[in-house]
């Protein structure tokens, strides 16, 4: 079995169906004896350029170990699913399990947000004294 990195973008109006899509795709991989090494749901993100007059899409990243038959099945599923705007399947040399840069940045922003709120609350208190 080979290692693959799969990224697909879903229509923003179909965001609530992403969990079901992920479950369906991961189920087909594991049923065929494959493994999922990393699964990241990046959420809605701005597109670099409009696709079908859309400016945002829901991104999902998966790193899997699977056979070619499963990958062919996934490609067909992506092609015939109208909610999937774009997809990319790349073969990699080894399993990638650490967090992606996109997810690390998202977590860093989430950590900084409470700090900003604390600073904003501290400034009015200091001005009142």
Swiss-Prot record:
- Pfam families associated with the record: Ribosomal_S6 (PF01250)
What PROSITE patterns does the record point to? RIBOSOMAL_S6
An example Gene Ontology biological process: translation
User: Which UniProt keyword terms apply here?
Assistant: Ribonucleoprotein, Ribosomal protein, RNA-binding, rRNA-binding
Which cellular components does GO assign to this protein?
cytosolic small ribosomal subunit
Basic and acidic residues bias located where?
104-129
Q: Which domain of life is it from?
A: Bacteria
Region span, Disordered: 103-129
Q: Which SUPFAM superfamilies match?
A: Ribosomal protein S6
Q: Does the keyword Ribosomal protein apply?
A: yes
* InterPro entries registered for this protein in UniProt: Ribosomal_bS6, Ribosomal_bS6_CS, Ribosomal_bS6_sf, Ribosomal_S6_plastid/chlpt, Transl_elong_EF1B/ribsomal_bS6
GO MF terms held by the record: small ribosomal subunit rRNA binding; structural constituent of ribosome
Family annotation (NCBIfam families): S6
Family membership: Belongs to the bacterial ribosomal protein bS6 family.
- UniProt-listed PANTHER family: MITOCHONDRIAL 28S RIBOSOMAL PROTEIN S6, SMALL RIBOSOMAL SUBUNIT PROTEIN BS6M
Job of this protein: Binds together with bS18 to 16S ribosomal RNA.
Protein name, per record = Small ribosomal subunit protein bS6
Q: Which organism is it from?
A: Vibrio campbellii (strain ATCC BAA-1116)
Lineage of the species this protein comes from = Bacteria, Pseudomonadati, Pseudomonadota, Gammaproteobacteria, Vibrionales
Gene (UniProt): rpsF
